């Protein structure tokens, strides 16, 4: 079976957060407005991640209250995925999930002022994103170039990639 994603088909990486596992409310309440790294599952996909690749940050879960399921951030990969063990509880609500991590990737993903709800994607006819079809899949998920083109009308302007240091 060929890989689901290749460098040629990739539009953006999609990184998911489950609010039952990672405390997005507290993260925001503490004044954070951007993600600088995210946990990923080691595998062929993390081997494909490159600095400059686009990133969509997706909040999963039931989508109730102010934690609407959908797109919460847009940005870029800024470093290669690397082996990693998270020893800081940080915003984790599920310690077993935190301890199960084995890799992370550095990103620059500003959070959106107004998340784009998954329901708005469905209303626009966007129903075949991997995160919609297989929501329990581990990070990273992905969005094809064609799917990203369809999303463009619903999303705010993509931020510029950060400058190299």
Identify the meaning behind each predicted range.
Residues 22-23, 64, 83-85:
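Eukaryotic short linear interaction motifs
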Residues 9, 18, 34, 54, ...:
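Acidic, low-complexity intrinsically disordered regions
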Residues 12, 54, 102:
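Beta-strand-rich binding-surface signature
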Residues 1-51, 128, 143-165:
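Compositionally biased, charged N-terminal/linker segments
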């Amino acid at each position: 079976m060929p890989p689901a994603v290749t460098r040629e088909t990739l539009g953006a990486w999609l990184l998911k957060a489950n609010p039952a596992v990672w405390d997005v409310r507290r993260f925001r309440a503490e004044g954070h407005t951007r993600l600088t790294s995210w946990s990923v599952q080691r595998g062929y996909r993390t081997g494909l991640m490159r600095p400059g690749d686009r990133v969509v940050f997706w909040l999963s879960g039931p989508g109730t209250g102010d934690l609407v399921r959908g797109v919460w951030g847009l940005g870029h990969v800024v470093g290669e995925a690397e082996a990693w063990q998270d020893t800081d509880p940080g915003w984790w609500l599920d310690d077993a999930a935190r301890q199960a991590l084995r890799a992370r990737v550095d990103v620059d993903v500003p959070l959106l002022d107004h998340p784009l709800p998954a329901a708005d994607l469905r209303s626009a006819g966007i129903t075949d994103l991997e995160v919609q079809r297989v929501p329990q899949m581990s990070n990273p998920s992905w969005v094809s170039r064609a799917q990203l083109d369809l999303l463009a009308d619903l999303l705010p302007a993509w931020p510029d990639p950060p400058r190299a240091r």
